[in-house]
């Protein structure tokens, strides 16, 4: 009923404001710095120009220029929050998170945008106090101001936001006591503010002169005794830390102790799982433990370089996938939360969405949506999937990876590409997982000789000398995936009974091509069924991806376009529209 009432009010007042919304965006763009040209699609030939398909803009409907939502996160925009927003009167959701906005939060923001339901200004450089006038956003459900430079106390007026379900003020410079009515938002909503006290953080204390004298005296006596004990314990901690390399918490480096990691999780079973979208029912760590049968080996979906994934069947009938990262996180807690929040906002039809995470000491669990048909690797090795389905998978996976390289903001290298990170949903559409994890985990595996010498089969040959991941390295890995699709073979250690040799897939295919026996390299389950010309086209695309010189490999977007032409012949992907607005003048810049 509340949603209907908001909608009804906006409909009544909005018919005359379509031109105002155009002026709103024009003013917004002109008042900001946009160094990476994220808003280059924002052009306004006249006051009636359609704005509903501009980057980050969503409208109530496509036929009128009334803005429902502005989603402009992670675009490197800088400047103060523009006053022109007051012309977007129908706006319900404003997300300017993880940019470089500075200055004060406008005290008039809720009189400008009275129908806001979601306001996310997190991850900027905003300063000053939280305006008490935010109480005028009477429909506000979610308020995120974390990771800024806000000072002062938390205004008591926030307690009057009756619809507020999510509040995050963490990682600022706020001080004073937390209003008791806000304590139910949990510690995560307030941590990282050294001057804050009160539930759910530590209690606020007040000391008179007598109490202070007692505390200081006791502190001095205790300090002398502690110094003696501490000096003796120093050596024990020093030796232990050299052995374990700081194996607690964030920033841990080399730290995993696999002896009883499940026991560690059980001892923290009441820890809440952080979810990026507000759930109907909150999930705790114990729910994941039970849903995976105690992380039983029978629930393993796939084991990859980034970690082991487990199928989690929840009591309500829904299914998730829980990944335990194999390496520790070298980031600080603030850096980790910044990176994980960015990953949690990424949505694309060919990517597996990251739904949430849970951290217990050095253990990091990631929660993803479950894909019904498993991995591409398992499908190729265990089942007979026909050629049209393989084309569908190849195009979808290429689309997802190309979007990470050329359409996502910020851009992402994958670094873990393989047929085990390409999952298949119930319609056999490809969904890429494990993107962005290279920024979270220890770089130890990139220094491991078995990684650099190509043992895993997907690692580009130049990595053995440069030790630096690159976009062209992702293209090489995807080329191996295409070879798997065409040949049905594994990426490494092929054992051909007839000729008795073991080689990498690239070497095996190259030998067949150089001997004029390309047909012998094709999977017999798909050869001779009317698609041989298409199969050879994909083989040529694959070979272009795995050339030894990185600069001679195509861009991922070029690989996608080549494969999409094949998909169009099968009528699979006519609904795909242009989603790569960036223009690249120098291919070398991307490699």
UniProtKB/Swiss-Prot annotation:
SUPFAM superfamilies: L domain-like, Protein kinase-like (PK-like). Glycans are attached at residues 46, 211. InterPro entries: Kinase-like_dom_sf (IPR011009), Leu-rich_rpt (IPR001611), LRR_dom_sf (IPR032675), LRR_N_plant-typ (IPR013210), PRK1-6/SRF4-like (IPR046959), Prot_kinase_dom (IPR000719), Ser-Thr/Tyr_kinase_cat_dom (IPR001245). It is a single-pass type I membrane protein. This is Probable LRR receptor-like serine/threonine-protein kinase At1g69990. It is an enzyme of class 2 (transferase). It holds the Pfam family PK_Tyr_Ser-Thr. Residues 19-218 are extracellular.
